[in-house]
Amino acid sequence: MTTVPVKAPIEELPTIHAVTNDELLLRPGFLRKAMGIMSVLGDKGAIHIRSQLLDSPTLYGLTLALLELNEQTKCWCIVNDRVDIALACGAQGVQLTHKSIAVPDVQAIAPALRIGASVHSPDEARDAEQAGADWCVAGHVFETPSHPGVPRRESSFINDVVAAVSFPVIAIGGIRPEHVRSLVHRGAHGVAAIRGIWNDENPELAASRYLSQV
């Protein structure tokens, strides 16, 4: 009889999520910077490996390299969208978007894999929780270059999402260190950032600024 893996109870979800993109992943010295950020954040942090352009072998190799750093730092590695890469590499989780395969389908393929869902409204957050996701990343909260022309929702958006669900909510979108404490007071479990960490002259120091506000 085949034994089906069972998802372990989720330990404390990291509070600071350093999200990447293709431009960041292809920068010279990316792994060196990632090591510094992961060392600062430790088990309170997660690196999100998010790519739309890298071929599968490259993304697989990069994810494995980051998971080697996870062994030293305990900082999580979460793969965006690519369930196959997350499962093959043994990542701590996968982050799904509205373009990804559905949460129940991921659970059928990989019952032990932790699942996050990217949402843009309280209703989407509620649907994600009911589908079986372990957390949601909700945004965007403030103006961000990745969504030009889209009005900011402000911190009250997080109040509405938190009120709709019982699982952890991670706020994303134009979030700077000085926003973190207010968002946590509004019920967010933590925050996600891209430019605020990776584009800083000292990414390690930037990561520590975010962490100090939780």
Residue ranges and their predicted role:
Residues 1-134, 150-153, 160, 166-167, ...:
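Conserved N-terminal beta1-alpha1 strand-loop-helix module at the mouth
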Residues 138, 143-149:
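Phosphate-binding beta-alpha-beta segment of Rossmann-like dinucleotide-binding domains, i.e.
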Residues 142-143, 175-177:
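Short acidic/polar capping segments at secondary-structure boundaries
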Residues 186:
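C-terminal binding/interaction regions
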